[in-house]
């Protein structure tokens, strides 16, 4: 699409604009590009890039700035993402914050805070989807015909359900029932347990069948918790010159944070892809803000993708720094959650 000269000038322009935040003129391009070109030649190349929609000219300046389309070409074909010099420091900070053994929700919230602190933009995390399978269950007798059902998910979440039964059960009977379910059905969804109980009903005593069906019904009737988006560091964006000078733009951005619907859908889409994803400007109709970019990566528990995290910042962000931050945080969050 572009000849080597035009690619070099576009790359230089974007790098200088990211560094300085000012429209880039031909003198700056001549100084930093390493090309021996006259100002007139550089201006001609800039005109060509503008016709291609890769740069634009602010009315108040003779220089040019990259467009979202220009950023996309830069990220896809010109950006060299290297392990940052402070990668070990980044990893140490993430590991220090994401403590294994902490409740899952606290660990995930800490990841959003880490992303915000390291990037100096907004950190976002789509929390893990609630599991439809169980790792272990336990019955506890509360009183006559009242039983507490304790469900432990593979992610370590503990859920409690109250059961009202037509008859009373002794502690030994409750232990027998929970041992049977854990031995035969652990790792399955409750819908699958229900199907298997129908097949095995002749092998079970009637009182045990009644109790097990009550447990399965109680577990499947409670609706799943909705996916939740955690956001940290929104105020960092007030310090971004590109945004803070435009109240309408800021209001639109904080509407996205407040409603969360588009952000939730964007993070959910990202969870179906491998590795780091980058959404620049208005590319995503889910977060349609021209001046903003979102860098995301999925995270896992025991090899299974359970959520997505990322950074929201201006299109004029240092992608070569933000991408490794998102990638390292996703990997270490996956490791921490898998160790729980």
Curated annotation (Swiss-Prot):
GO terms for biological process: negative regulation of DNA-templated transcription. Pfam families: HrcA, HrcA_DNA-bdg. Keywords: Repressor, Stress response, Transcription, Transcription regulation. The keyword Membrane does not apply. InterPro entries: GAF-like_dom_sf (IPR029016), HrcA (IPR002571), HrcA_C (IPR021153), WH-like_DNA-bd_sf (IPR036388), WH_DNA-bd_sf (IPR036390), WHTH_HrcA_DNA-bd (IPR005104), WHTH_transcript_rep_HrcA_IDD (IPR023120). Negative regulator of class I heat shock genes (grpE-dnaK-dnaJ and groELS operons). Prevents heat-shock induction of these operons. PANTHER family: HEAT-INDUCIBLE TRANSCRIPTION REPRESSOR HRCA. HAMAP family: HrcA (MF_00081). This is Heat-inducible transcription repressor HrcA. It comes from Burkholderia ambifaria (strain MC40-6).
């Amino acid at each position: 699409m572009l000849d080597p000269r035009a690619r070099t000038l576009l790359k230089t322009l974007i790098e200088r604009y990211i560094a300085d935040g000012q429209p880039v003129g031909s003198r700056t391009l001549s100084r930093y590009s390493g090309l021996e070109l006259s100002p007139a030649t550089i201006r001609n190349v800039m005109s060509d890039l503008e016709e291609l929609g890769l740069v634009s000219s602010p009315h108040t300046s003779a220089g040019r700035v990259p467009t979202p389309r220009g950023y996309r070409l830069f990220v896809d074909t010109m950006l060299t993402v290297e392990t940052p010099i402070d990668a070990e420091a980044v990893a140490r900070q993430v590991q220090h914050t994401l403590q294994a053994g902490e409740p899952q929700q606290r660990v995930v919230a800490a990841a959003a805070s880490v992303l915000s602190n390291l990037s100096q933009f907004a950190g976002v995390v789509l929390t893990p989807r609630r599991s439809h399978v169980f790792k272990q269950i336990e019955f506890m007798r509360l009183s006559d015909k009242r039983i507490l059902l304790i469900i432990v998910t593979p992610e370590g979440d503990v859920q409690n359900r109250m059961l009202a039964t037509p008859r009373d059960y002794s502690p030994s009977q409750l232990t027998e029932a929970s041992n049977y379910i854990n031995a035969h059905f652990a790792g399955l969804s409750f819908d699958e347990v229900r199907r298997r109980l129908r097949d095995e009903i002749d092998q079970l005593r009637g009182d045990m069948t009644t109790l097990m069906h009550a447990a399965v019904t109680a577990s499947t009737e409670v609706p799943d918790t909705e996916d939740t988006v955690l956001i940290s560091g929104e105020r960092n964006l007030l310090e971004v010159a590109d945004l803070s000078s435009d109240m309408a733009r800021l209001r639109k951005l904080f509407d996205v944070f407040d409603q969360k619907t588009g952000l939730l859908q964007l993070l959910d889409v990202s969870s179906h892809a491998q590795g780091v994803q980058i959404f620049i400007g208005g590319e995503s109709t889910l977060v349609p803000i021209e001046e903003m970019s979102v860098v995301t990566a999925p995270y896992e528990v025991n090899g299974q993708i359970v959520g997505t995290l990322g950074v929201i910042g201006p299109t004029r962000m240092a992608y070569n720094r933000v991408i490794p931050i998102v990638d390292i945080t996703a990997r270490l969050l996956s490791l921490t959650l898998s160790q729980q």
